[in-house]
């Protein structure tokens, strides 16, 4: 029996479809990338300036990493479209002060 990726995924989840990781601070985005890679699931990075760990940003080829500031929703949406990701997941903290500026 295959090891489940996550019990929270829908039954029709497509492992061949790309997932965009919206990466905040900390270890969670790094752990998520490692988990997706271990299952061979393609993924792209949506990094936030001064939030996403540099080592995570550098772990992606330039064609699979995108960056924006926290408040740049339009740019984030353009980046998501450019990445051609079918799914998106947020992992890691965003500095609260930056959310309300």
Summary of predicted features, one role per range:
Residues 27, 49-53, 72-73, 95-96:
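Short active-site-proximal "capping" loops at secondary-structure junctions
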Residues 17, 63, 86:
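Conserved acidic residues
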Residues 73-101:
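N-terminal glycine-rich phosphate/adenylate-binding segment common to multiple enzyme folds
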Residues 9-15, 58, 81-83:
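Solvent-exposed alpha-helices and their adjacent loops that cap or buttress functional pockets
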Residues 2-4, 8-48:
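N-terminal basic/disordered segments at the start of proteins
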Residues 31-32, 55, 99-101:
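Short glycine-/acidic-enriched loop or helix-start segments at secondary-structure transitions
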Residues 47-69:
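N-terminal beta-loop-helix "entrance" segment that forms/cooperates
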Residues 14, 27-31, 68-75, 83:
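Conserved active-site and cofactor/substrate-binding residues in soluble primary-metabolism enzymes
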């Amino acid at each position: 029996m295959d090891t489940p990726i996550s019990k929270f995924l829908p039954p029709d989840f497509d492992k061949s479809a790309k997932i965009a990781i919206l990466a905040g601070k900390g270890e969670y985005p790094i752990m998520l990338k490692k988990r997706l890679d271990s299952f061979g699931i393609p993924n792209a990075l949506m990094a936030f300036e001064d939030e996403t760990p540099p080592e995570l940003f550098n772990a992606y080829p330039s064609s699979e990493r995108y960056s924006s500031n926290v408040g740049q929703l339009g740019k984030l949406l353009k980046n998501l479209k450019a990445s051609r990701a079918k799914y998106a997941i947020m992992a890691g903290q965003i500095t609260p002060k930056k959310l309300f500026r």
